[in-house]
């Protein structure tokens, strides 16, 4: 009896380890979680088939929201043990520095600062000479030099796009795989890192279009798209299909529209998906049309031109998708 129970526990542990390796967090709403694999398939409870799980922080478990099956346990809480209610309290009570970052190549390295207030020109030239030698010593191999160049380019593009740190970390992780695979040889570092960032944003559920990314890099859009397909094929990365709903928050934020516009736009997109209207359509164009419809329904009107600019699509795309959705979903737009 005990042997059978021990075998069952071992099987459960093996299953949980496989889940951790294969799946990653897709959506979080409060304590409710959903996970997907690289192909976009949702993780299902092995007992009841449910796809929604609950995080029990007190017990360190993730359980099925339907039947209570324990999917993962012994999850460590990496947050602080203290509580803070203001930014000042948080700063006062923190006892550690920031974590090491993948997006920087200067972890735990003392840098020679060249911005001196001293007017002494001789001193400044001496410091610049030391700085130059420090850079030569630190970056020795071609791999390191390439990585530093890519990191600087990634930081520049990401800053222009306003993407979060998680996307930058993911992009650099993908780029390191590309670099180790020898795919960078003979290709533009700018195009490769831009393709990695596009891929990372989709992985993190915060997509940025190739048109949007190509605005902030010297690499042409076609070259970035070519590199993107090469990376996905050679590294066998299967990305989930772009969800139009993921484009809505960015459009709404840029247009400074209220939150209920986003909710209404997402409702329109979900209804369109149920009726099979989203297949084969540009997700950014669909999201733009849904936001336009929501703005008309809620009385927070924005022009098609404004919405097209926020979504990085053409006015014609917004107009065509708007007409399709309004007709097929039988949406009555109030005339003012």
From Swiss-Prot:
SMART domains in alphabetical order: CYCLIN
Keyword terms: Metal-binding, Repeat, Transcription, Transcription regulation, Zinc, Zinc-finger
Record GO cellular component, one term: transcription preinitiation complex
Signal sequence interval, chain numbering: none
Chain ranges of zinc fingers (TFIIB-type): 41-72
The UniProt record lists the keyword Cell membrane: no
UniProt protein name: Transcription initiation factor IIB
Source organism (scientific name): Caldivirga maquilingensis (strain ATCC 700844 / DSM 13496 / JCM 10307 / IC-167)
